[in-house]
């Protein structure tokens, strides 16, 4: 092709960023235009100069990874002949049909009365009713009846004690006839103390029953772990060394959305290498399913995927896909995977963005599934590790020390009708596709639409279809990370709170197993207990005010002979308070006793683990009222329809600034101070009972800030406080994750979108991975031209994120933008690109040197 335009002055700069030899660079430096340069690189004639950059994508891409891309047959062409990178396997669609929810029992009853039938369910090859009846189901039912008796019996006794503690004992003497003859004010003053006491007693019963459930769960978990005699544990179903059948293919899927890219792909690489070390890598494929809508992060993900595939030789085993339409959030992401590739796999392991799993753990999960044909989901108990802030280290210590008791206890009571936590679990693909697709909740408002907390619902649907849901609580090799500070944890809790409240709409859905109805209830109580506790404290304060400010009514009947005196039984109050403290803190003591018995070396020794437990208990006492108020706010926000978003500034060291702590905790501090002054004015002696609450609220700002500091967490680890075995003797997977995270951060891609537009190599990768591959059509061409013109007109600083996403998804528009930025010399884009390189202290030296086949001569 011919062109009389002068030689661009930036041609040499462009060539310097392509990895090739000096001879190749000198040969291409003679090109008159960028269109000619791209034509030479592509080794084929280009009729339209605007498409020249698109034509050279393949050559620019293979300059760095030619051998591996060709060996894995990763390069292909789309329907229009444009080069694309096969980042996903060929699509083989499977039907995924969610069943509509019928949450209104009145509507269901009316349909039954009127003879209307529901649409027939889809027919499947293997119906769940054909699964054999297992003995564990009968055993589980008996155990849960025992748990119910223990909880209710304990609550009734405690409620009886609580009733005796309250001062006003005369409900039976309140005469309804007398009330009708009094004024409203007289009636209110007479009835108010008893109404307050009744409300307090009701709330106390609910809260005590909730505490009792946790106590009995932890106690049975302690006995299970201490004796080691659990013939129903799922991990005993396999010997652990059976060869995995060739057809038992497993997909490891990692849904991500705007995550920390270096950490995500470090954990993925560590998991991949651990699976490879088992010799069973051919049974596994890895999928990164991205819902990222921040273009800089999306480009960084693409580069990180290419890097991890190149470094592990994982092309054809590690796949990457970014959705353009983010439907139904995480559950929709998994639905899309099941619809496109789910039929190719027998099992699926779901990973979180911070998950790491060992190869031994993953192969054991597959063997357990093979050995347990009626198991639909097997959930591991992830161990928290890898954090440095004081807050996170205390939390991961708590989950590592106390968590095993509760997970073992859950397994004891639930057996194969247990929890699924949404990650670090293996799922039988066929029943999951057939029965666990989630339809939106009907109606309008905050509790309608796409289900947020999908995991509990999927477990309930799996059990409804007749498949078991198990917790492999004793299976090692499963890891996760915790939020680094209190405010980040609360952001997560707000989403979980809304999701659990939504799930409760499914409590009465037809066919749900009673255990999973209870799971929905416990999910709600995890957050609803906070406002109940808050209202309990408020009503107690109101009762104190009534008792202090109002003259007691001693005679409730017209001809009552003896006065009714308010009663005080401090000995009963102390006994009940002591019992509650035992229920709350005995599980923690039992956890440490278990560690003493099993070996405390990995926790820093008996003395250090005991001191750490005491410090963690003090810290949990300080944080409990803070969480109570936040969770109360979250519950109210969900019912009032407030948006569940909380934008918090990014912090490299994960610490909480003082200004943010004041903003978030200031109202709590003020409430605590006012509450303390009110109680002191009413009755100073009562302040001792309320001191743990109000003092914690007044200290919330410094506690939140100080606990978020990394230096304090590292110092505590150096002194062997809050130490966990994964730090004392870290497994190879966690060592590799830390190493790869450090390496990834060293050369992490910054200003990704600008790089994808301007940089020769990044543009080639972005064009090859772009998924919006439309055929030639005039309306599409007009839109493309408008997008490119707009990007050049406003520059990178003013281009909106939505416009960036559209360009990043369209290989043609992105290629044209790249070509015009260089050929027309758009300095605003070029300067931003140069600045991003100069700001990177780890940028490679220029000109880039050739890699592999990049040293071959450039076709003329």
From Swiss-Prot:
Alphabetically ordered keywords of this record: Cell inner membrane, Cell membrane, Glycosyltransferase, Membrane, Transferase, Transmembrane, Transmembrane helix
Top-level class of the enzyme under EC nomenclature: transferase
GO CC term (a single one): plasma membrane
Keyword Glycosyltransferase in record: yes
Gene Ontology BP annotations: glucan biosynthetic process
E.C. number: 2.4.1.-
Location in or out of the cell: Cell inner membrane
GO molecular function ontology, one term from the record: hexosyltransferase activity
InterPro entries named in the record: Glucans_biosynth_gluTrFase_H, Glyco_trans_2-like, Glycosyltr_2/OpgH_subfam, Nucleotide-diphossugar_trans
Recorded topology in the membrane: Multi-pass membrane protein
Pathway assigned to this chain's UniProt record: Glycan metabolism; osmoregulated periplasmic glucan (OPG) biosynthesis
Keyword ATP-binding among record annotations: no
Membrane-spanning intervals of the chain: 146-166, 200-220, 519-539, 576-596, 610-630, 686-706
Matches recorded under CDD domains: Glucan_BSP_MdoH
NCBIfam families found in the cross-reference section: PRK05454.1-1 (NF003955), PRK05454.2-1 (NF003958), PRK05454.2-5 (NF003962)
Family listed: Belongs to the glycosyltransferase 2 family. OpgH subfamily.
Function: Involved in the biosynthesis of osmoregulated periplasmic glucans (OPGs).
Record protein name field: Glucans biosynthesis glucosyltransferase H
Species assigned in the record: Pseudomonas savastanoi pv. phaseolicola (strain 1448A / Race 6)
Gene: opgH
């Amino acid at each position: 092709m011919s062109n009389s335009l002068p030689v661009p002055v930036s041609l040499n700069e462009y060539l310097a960023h392509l990895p090739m030899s000096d001879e190749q660079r000198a040969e291409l430096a003679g090109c008159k235009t960028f269109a000619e340069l791209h034509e030479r690189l592509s080794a084929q004639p280009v009729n339209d100069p605007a498409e020249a950059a698109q034509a050279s994508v393949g050559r620019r891409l293979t300059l760095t990874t030619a051998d591996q891309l060709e060996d894995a047959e990763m390069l292909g062409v789309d329907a229009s002949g444009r080069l694309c990178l096969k980042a996903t396997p060929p699509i083989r669609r499977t039907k995924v049909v969610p069943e509509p929810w019928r949450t209104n029992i009145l509507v269901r009853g009316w349909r039954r009365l009127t003879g209307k039938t529901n649409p027939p369910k889809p027919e499947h090859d293997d119906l769940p009713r054909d699964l054999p009846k297992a003995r564990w189901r009968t055993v589980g039912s008996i155990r849960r009846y025992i748990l119910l008796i223990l909880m209710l019996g304990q609550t009734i006794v405690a409620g009886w004690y609580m009733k005796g503690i309250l001062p006003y004992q005369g409900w039976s003497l309140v005469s309804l006839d007398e009330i009708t003859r009094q004024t409203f004010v007289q009636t209110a003053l007479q009835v108010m103390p008893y109404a307050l006491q009744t409300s307090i007693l009701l709330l106390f019963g609910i809260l005590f029953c909730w505490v009792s459930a946790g106590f009995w769960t932890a106690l049975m978990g302690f006995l299970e772990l201490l004796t080691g005699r659990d013939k129903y544990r799922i991990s005993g179903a396999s010997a652990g060394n059976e060869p995995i059948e060739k057809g038992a293919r497993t997909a490891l899927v990692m849904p991500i959305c705007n995550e920390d890219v270096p950490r995500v792909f470090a954990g993925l690489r560590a998991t991949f290498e651990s699976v490879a070390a088992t010799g069973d890598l051919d049974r596994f494929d890895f999928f990164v399913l991205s819902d990222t809508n921040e273009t800089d992060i999306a480009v960084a993900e693409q580069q990180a995927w290419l890097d991890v595939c190149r470094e592990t030789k994982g092309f054809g085993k590690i796949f990457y896909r970014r959705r353009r339409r983010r439907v139904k959030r995480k559950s929709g992401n998994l639905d899309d995977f099941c619809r496109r590739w789910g039929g190719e796999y027998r099992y699926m392991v779901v990973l979180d963005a911070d998950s790491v799993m060992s190869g031994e753990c993953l192969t054991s999960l597959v063997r357990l599934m093979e050995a347990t044909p009626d198991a639909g989901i097997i959930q591991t108990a992830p161990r928290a590790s890898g954090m440095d802030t004081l807050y996170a280290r205390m939390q991961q210590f708590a989950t590592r020390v106390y968590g095993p008791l509760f997970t073992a206890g859950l397994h004891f009571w639930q057996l194969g009708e247990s929890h699924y936590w949404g990650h670090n679990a293996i799922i039988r693909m066929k029943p999951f596709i057939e029965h666990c697709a989630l339809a939106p909740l009907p109606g309008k408002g905050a509790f309608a639409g796409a289900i947020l907390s999908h995991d509990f619902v999927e477990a309930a649907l799996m059990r409804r279809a007749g498949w078991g849901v198990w917790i492999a609580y004793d299976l090692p090799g499963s890891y996760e990370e915790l939020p680094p500070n209190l405010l980040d944890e609360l952001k997560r809790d707000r989403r979980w709170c809304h999701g659990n409240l939504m799930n409760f709409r499914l409590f009465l859905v037809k066919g749900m197993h009673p255990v999973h109805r209870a799971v929905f209830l416990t999910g709600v109580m995890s957050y609803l207990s906070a406002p109940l506790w808050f209202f309990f404290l408020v009503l107690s304060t109101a009762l104190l005010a009534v008792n202090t400010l109002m003259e007691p009514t001693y005679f409730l009947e017209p001809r009552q002979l003896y006065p009714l005196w308010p009663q005080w039984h401090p000995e009963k109050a102390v006994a009940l308070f002591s019992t509650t403290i035992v229920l709350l803190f005995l599980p923690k003591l039992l956890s440490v006793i278990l560690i003493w018995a099993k070996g405390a070396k990995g926790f820093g020794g008996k003395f250090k683990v005991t001191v750490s437990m005491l410090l963690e208990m003090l810290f949990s006492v300080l944080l409990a009222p803070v969480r109570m108020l936040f969770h109360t706010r979250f519950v109210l926000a969900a019912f009032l329809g407030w948006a569940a978003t909380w934008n918090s500034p990014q912090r490299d060291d994960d610490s909480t600034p003082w200004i943010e702590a004041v903003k978030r905790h200031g109202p709590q501090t003020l409430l605590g101070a006012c509450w303390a002054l009110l109680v002191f004015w009413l009755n100073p002696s009562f302040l001792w009972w309320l001191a743990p609450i109000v003092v914690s609220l007044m200290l919330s700002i410094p506690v939140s800030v100080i606990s978020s500091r990394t230096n304090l967490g590292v110092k505590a680890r150096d002194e062997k406080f809050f130490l966990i075995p994964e730090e004392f003797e870290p497994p190879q997977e966690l060592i590799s994750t830390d190493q790869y995270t450090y390496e990834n951060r060293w050369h992490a891609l910054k200003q990704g979108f600008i790089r994808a537009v301007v940089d020769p190599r990044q543009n080639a990768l972005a064009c090859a991975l772009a998924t919006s591959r439309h055929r030639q059509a005039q309306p599409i061409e007009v839109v493309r031209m408008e997008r490119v013109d707009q990007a050049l007109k406003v520059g990178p600083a003013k281009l909106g994120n939505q416009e960036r996403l559209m360009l990043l998804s369209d290989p043609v528009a992105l290629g044209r933008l790249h070509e015009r930025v260089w050929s027309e010399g758009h300095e605003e884009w070029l300067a931003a690109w140069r600045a991003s390189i100069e700001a990177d202290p780890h940028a490679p030296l220029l000109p880039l040197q050739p890699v592999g086949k990049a040293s071959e001569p450039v076709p003329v």
